């Protein structure tokens, strides 16, 4: 019930958005009186696409109806009488609505609960700046709702005026028929005698003159009514067009932009419910006005009166048709975009939705939607209305889907769940452009009939640009193309034009957004991190971020040309950082344990005055996705050391925390945090007992130059091998199998190569699994392989 309590505290626009969620499909009173029961049911456990879950959905429907009936029976007193009737009515209504489609009830309640939670979360997480933004947004939404109220009133006014015009015209026609009857009576006067004819003729003439004068005046009045009504419709359509522009060209375009940025890791684009409610109100008012205009045209045809009205009505009729055409074609949107990096022969999904499908009764004749993949050039031709019918650049399997109307949520949508790109036809590439820079788009098209087939619309919508790959190795460069396009695409562009150069601060914003999303962290890129990246990209030594604000970055600098002195591009290096953090080091990054964006010289400057054993973790310059340890330790040869970088492959063998735990001479995480305080919760527990007489070997990180230091600092800490009570463990002299490896594992810069020690480790593991009797006791043990410390080398 806590969710409903929080939802009731929503204010302003958030409260209005919550109210939109409810209606006849699920009354808000049911949510209120059954809040605790509703929130305790397993709505999310039901798979809406699995027919076998229908029985569970039916049980939930029956439970809901029973709870409502019980709640109704418990109502007593004068105030409870009306509530008892109302709750009983709701129980019957829900039973009748969902009896044949219980899955729709589940879909409806899940939709409501999800959006309630989202609104509460957004309200709770809003900062002061976000509050200002929400206030501005609420003000804008308030203005939209006020305009709808104004449109409702003027539409009601023209409806009243139309009825008055119709009544006036009907009375005019009656009087006109009376005039014709008088004229017929004049023809009959010839049959009367002269005296009687003269008497009757005088009376008829007076009546005719009076009636003709009235008809003339009334015809002018009718014409005036018609002109005034047409003018009112013109003003209504001006207001309608203005409101539609705000909703379609501002609000809907902003939603699409948020959807595009969400592809780069930006905040979710948000629900379409408010937009749909606005579009449905537009559709309703537009249709009411269209019907009024058609009735006015019928009245004019019924009683033609020369004047400007026919031309005015033709104009407003054409205008209202344009407005409704724009509404229908613009509200056919892609709710769930296909993946923007699209691999051939791989299943993918997408969802399209018509925001006005319910109000315009499009669902009465469910339309079919077809998806095809087209090239950038074909997309340009399509928007120019050039003849590109049936042209495509590949073959998509399962590319047709019928739109379904979900009564509970009022949505008309088509869910493509099992599409697959079978093949792709590429265009001739330009200059240095690679296949991962070539953009395609998925075209969704359909045909909608509106108003009993009065109007038929051919609708099309294009997905965000997609890059097609055939191998996973192309994914990183394809992602760079998508990132650049999503970040820097301008509204209303020609497909898929994007600036070749952007300012460094613009790129910083895009990189930070992507970084936080990929690493799934609120700890984004700091000012110091961005300075480091700028130095790397521009090959500069300036340490002031402001010095880079006016500098431009080209696409070639970003991911076509290698960085000076290296065999990789800027994006490839940055993407490698995100990859290793995402796969192995999210908690360490969030803990602030990884400094990361510092070079070797900066690490030297940071550590030089620190106590021995102080270390930091930084991203390697020489190895994409590599992390190296730099530490302070005075020796006759040097006082700063750098371990050869670890990569994703290394961390899949032994975690970073365990490797650091093995190196006992690493004591403080820069600047002065005890290592175990930071990393001990991530150490792999050491098992003390053998299983079935066998002990499980472990790999241990060892740096030969520091074996003595490690042993001294480890003191008397027992290893797993020492602690194991298994009888299979023989005295240490029995492990004299290999002489010490004479090759150093620290390079001339003090970097340790893990690969050169891993072969030894694997060989030892193999020997540990052999029977003890087969071991040769004559060989001396390799120095440092079985030193006391955390874990054992296997």
Swiss-Prot record:
GO CC terms, sorted: cytoplasm; cytosol; nucleus; RNA polymerase II transcription regulator complex
GO molecular function: DNA binding; DNA-binding transcription factor activity, RNA polymerase II-specific; RNA polymerase II cis-regulatory region sequence-specific DNA binding
UniProt KW keywords: Activator, Cytoplasm, DNA-binding, Lactation, Nucleus, Phosphoprotein, SH2 domain, Transcription, Transcription regulation, Ubl conjugation
Region of interest (Disordered), ranges: 771-794
Leader peptide range in chain numbering: none
Pfam families the UniProt entry points to: SH2 (PF00017), STAT_alpha (PF01017), STAT_bind (PF02864), STAT_int (PF02865), STAT_linker (PF21354)
GO biological-process terms attached to the record: cell surface receptor signaling pathway via JAK-STAT; cytokine-mediated signaling pathway; defense response; development of secondary female sexual characteristics; female pregnancy; growth hormone receptor signaling pathway via JAK-STAT; lactation; lipid storage
Predominant location category: cytoplasm
SMART domains assigned: SH2, STAT_int
Residues bearing the modification Phosphotyrosine: 90, 682, 694
InterPro entries: p53-like_TF_DNA-bd_sf, SH2, SH2_dom_sf, STAT, STAT5_CCD, STAT5a/5b_DBD, STAT_linker, STAT_N_sf
Residue ranges occupied by any SH2 domain in the UniProt entry: 589-686
Record PTM: ISGylated. Tyrosine phosphorylated in response to KITLG/SCF, IL2, IL3, IL7, IL15, CSF2/GMCSF, GH1, PRL, EPO and THPO. Activated KIT promotes phosphorylation on tyrosine residues and subsequent translocation to the nucleus. Tyrosine phosphorylated in response to constitutively activated FGFR1, FGFR2, FGFR3 and FGFR4. Tyrosine phosphorylation is required for DNA-binding activity and dimerization. Serine phosphorylation is also required for maximal transcriptional activity.
Cellular compartment(s): Cytoplasm; Nucleus
Family to which the UniProt record says this protein belongs: Belongs to the transcription factor STAT family.
Complex formation: Forms a homodimer or a heterodimer with a related family member. Binds NR3C1. Interacts with NCOA1 and SOCS7. Interacts with ERBB4. Interacts with EBF4. Interacts with CD69.
Summary of the function given for this chain in its UniProt record: Carries out a dual function: signal transduction and activation of transcription. Mediates cellular responses to the cytokine KITLG/SCF and other growth factors. May mediate cellular responses to activated FGFR1, FGFR2, FGFR3 and FGFR4. Binds to the GAS element and activates PRL-induced transcription. Regulates the expression of milk proteins during lactation.
UniProt protein name: Signal transducer and activator of transcription 5A
Originating organism: Bos taurus
